[in-house]
Amino acid sequence: MVDLKRLRQEPEVFHRAIREKGVALDLEALLALDQEVQELKKRLQEVQTERNQVAKRVPKAPPEEKEALIARGRALGEEAKRLEEALREKEAQLEALLLQVPLPPWPGAPVGGEEANREIKRVGSPPEFSFPPLDHVALMEKNGWWEPRISQVSGSRSYALKGDLALYELALLRFAMDFMARRGFLPMTLPSYAREKAFLGTGHFPAYRDQVWAIAETDLYLTGTAEVVLNALHSGEILPYEALPLRYAGYAPAFRSEAGSFGKDVRGLMRVHQFHKVEQYVLTEASLEASDRAFQELLENAEEILRLLELPYRLVEVATGDMGPGKWRQVDVEVYLPSEGRYRETHSCSALLDWQARRANLRYRDPEGRVRYAYTLNNTALATPRILAMLLENHQLQDGRVRVPKALVPYMGKEVLEPCG
């Protein structure tokens, strides 16, 4: 959510943000509704003031005036009730619209849709094989590393790993948590579900509600990232300045409906309904300098993880129309997938300034004693099984086995993934 005061003072800034981010929102209608709310508040205050004045006059009024004053007080009470009901309705409408207002993006963001995304860095080179390489599905089938019957049990976009590959997935998650702990982040294991308020706080609702599964007969929804829970942990609190920045590494199984992705990545591990994710989350003081420092830290963490996994990757500056309504800046990290001959996203590093904090009521007391909204940031540390597809394809050997990166050998106790059986 944006600062309503700033929205009133600089509507042209938000008109541009709406246009550049491709948000379907009538800002003039929102501002007109805001004016209605202000006028209703003013009129309600006037009515309440007059009603109080009338109530004070009644006990001292002469008999011939008392009945009229009582009638006037009753009429003012009825008018106040009508105004309060109208105000509640208009404020609810205004809040629903304010939830849709995008945060203006940083000046360095390319303007446009996905086609305007710009590569800003490339590390490592795609592998060169002396043999015909296999894709990750063929490698799993050759080595007996996945269970094809799982679709009969759990439907499409499900997966079940076996043998060394099952252990490899678990090793990767522990590796990521250990890495984040060494970087000073607090490791946390978290639930995979939350109430609607938490999704509103991150901005997943209302914009991405179709990607979220509701748990029947409850007020809970399955999360697609630990960010949802982490962002809600301190909702309503006023944190001491000395506690900032908060730096969390949250692990939770994640779920996405993949609505709208019909026909995309239907084979293998690239797009599944349930996956596992270690998420980086930072809450900082409200300054661009602090946010920029945290952004670079989150990005460097992701890069170092990929270097340790010995994977070729690139960084992409995400354009305004592709970054989402709440983002100030977003840089995607993409890893090379040999079977497709292109880079695929594995991480999204995002700075959201106070957009989430206003929605989730995340505040702190600054050194001058003022209560302010914090800034939030997040980035993936590691998500499986997508990263497994990259590891299998980039590290495959001629005999179909797969090499284990040096950083993972202590976790696996071996240098090569062996076939099942």
UniProtKB/Swiss-Prot annotation:
InterPro entries per UniProt: aa-tRNA-synt_IIb, aa-tRNA-synth_II, aa-tRNA-synth_II/BPL/LPL, Ser-tRNA-ligase_type_1, Ser-tRNA-synth_1_N, SerRS_1_N_sf, SerRS_core, tRNA-bd_arm
Pathway terms, separated by semicolons: Aminoacyl-tRNA biosynthesis; selenocysteinyl-tRNA(Sec) biosynthesis; L-seryl-tRNA(Sec) from L-serine and tRNA(Sec): step 1/1
GO-annotated molecular function: ATP binding; serine-tRNA ligase activity
Regions annotated as coiled coil: none
Record-listed E.C. numbers: 6.1.1.11
Reaction(s) catalysed by this chain's protein: tRNA(Ser) + L-serine + ATP = L-seryl-tRNA(Ser) + AMP + diphosphate + H(+); tRNA(Sec) + L-serine + ATP = L-seryl-tRNA(Sec) + AMP + diphosphate + H(+)
Residues binding ATP, per UniProt: R256, S257, E258, V272, E345, T346, H347, S348
UniProt-annotated binding residues for L-serine: T225, A226, E227, E279, T380
Keyword annotations: Aminoacyl-tRNA synthetase, ATP-binding, Cytoplasm, Ligase, Nucleotide-binding, Protein biosynthesis
GO biological process: selenocysteine biosynthetic process; seryl-tRNA aminoacylation
Subcellular location: Cytoplasm
Keyword Protein biosynthesis: yes
This protein's GO CC annotations: cytoplasm
Keyword DNA-binding (UniProt): no
Entries under PROSITE patterns matching the protein: AA_TRNA_LIGASE_II
Binding partners and assembly: Homodimer. The tRNA molecule binds across the dimer.
Family: Belongs to the class-II aminoacyl-tRNA synthetase family. Type-1 seryl-tRNA synthetase subfamily.
PANTHER family per record: SERINE--TRNA LIGASE, SERYL-TRNA SYNTHETASE
Domain notes: Consists of two distinct domains, a catalytic core and a N-terminal extension that is involved in tRNA binding.
Function: Catalyzes the attachment of serine to tRNA(Ser). Is also able to aminoacylate tRNA(Sec) with serine, to form the misacylated tRNA L-seryl-tRNA(Sec), which will be further converted into selenocysteinyl-tRNA(Sec).
Protein name: Serine--tRNA ligase
Species, as recorded: Thermus thermophilus (strain ATCC 27634 / DSM 579 / HB8)
Gene encoding the protein: serS
